[in-house]
Amino acid sequence: MNRIFKIFTVVSLFSVFSSPFCVSFAQDAEYNLIRRTYKVNTDGTMDISFRKEIKLLRNRAITAYADKGETFILYNPATDRLTINESYTIRKDGSRVQTPQNAFIDQLPSQCQDCGRYNGIRERVVVHTALEYDCIIVLDYTIHRQGSYLDEALVLVEDCPVKKYEVIVDLPKDSEQSIGYTVTHGDFKIKTLKDKHTFHQIATDLPQKYIDNYLPAAETLYPTVNISCGKRPSDLAESSDETLPEAIYTVGELHDNDQLTYATNIRDYVLDNIHTTNFPLSLVGYKRSSAKETFLSGCGTPADKKRLVAAMLREAGFGAEEYDNGVHVTVHEDGRPMTYNLSTDRKRPARLDGAAIDEQRTIDISRDLIWDGPRVGGSYRQMTLPTEDGSIRIDPAFLTSVRKAPLKVRNCNEKYHYTIALPRTPKHTLVKPIDISRTEKGIGTIRICIKQLPTGQIDVIRELSIDVRDGIVTPKQYKAFRRMMQDWTTYKTVTIRAEKGKPIMGS
């Protein structure tokens, strides 16, 4: 009987942790309401209000996630006045417990700890009290801000479902300003109410955000509201003539005879050596620091760092102009000017301006290798094939067996042919020849052939072609794609065995 109970327990636990639907049936928490309000005042100031009502459904919501038991509010005392309008917990029995005064704590945000220029920014921590199953946390606050310019991209998603999400922009009735907005609906329930001075967006029944790896950009997955109003600060204008004499020595140290490599070295220097203070630009009035300020302080926002890259490129003699996702840099190849797009948020390879973003990455390598694999037990040795620059980087260990979210992949066409010379003594044989060749409709093809030649060498052919629309693997295609990635990774190792009775020479 005891054995039957143990088996039943194991089966029950397996079904709970392996079911793709278990999260749907056991949410940790749920937002009844999220409301963001932007009210422009006649004196040129703005009131930014936020209200949330979140119901805690499981113990995990209380103990495992700091963002449920605590709320973090970023503000800049130099331009903002923060007011907590309401903060309380509604217990399961309906009683209200007000958040005590000692539960409001101001601190320096972690984003600003390594950047003295932004040490004036503060983070108000609200520690919610009286938390229990089925309680509802209510928080309502307003930030009164000097300045009325607004440029926000709001992705309407949280880490638990939202019953109702509202975005409101309210201008004075006699204002000459207008509200600019774009809304990405997707398959979600969204209603828009507007007149000449008011914009009101209501989204209902929003699911929680995906936690999968290799996700596409958030704005392509979830409903997104882009809103703007007011006069754009002049500081945001592109500084097309800004140079940086203070960085001339650094620029010289990064020099390379290949101009594109030289430009990339400058970008990489900024990414590696300038600390990122990653907070919303609205905290500093949408103003960017000069390239000199960012360089000398060793820190800046992503927008500051982009401006710095452009200025350092100009100091090095390149033509450089900023754009949304990086810098256009002009180099000379064979005497001809060529413009490349250089990302400034990560170390992506430079891309020729005008080339398709999802163009296939083509690799065709054929070369001889000398066996370089350790002993893995007894008379066996194992070698992992090299990872070539630019090759596909999808780790199947992060690909769950069931997936509902689309997967972002860079289309590729990779071909590798290796001939591996084995140790001369003793004689070695390939443990397991591999011969895989198949085509997955709408995804691509895979071919892996590992065999031993009559000469004793190991012959390896690996070919992978991924060609999916817009670089997106759909949930319907996912199972076949995952299998391709598993095979591509699994058969990247070659195992050999020494002839029986003869020891392996060396380690």
Task: Label the predicted regions.
Residues 1-6:
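Positively charged n-region of N-terminal signal peptides that target proteins for export
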Residues 14-24:
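C-terminal segment of classical bacterial N-terminal signal peptides
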Residues 26-507:
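A sensor for short, sequence-defined functional sites
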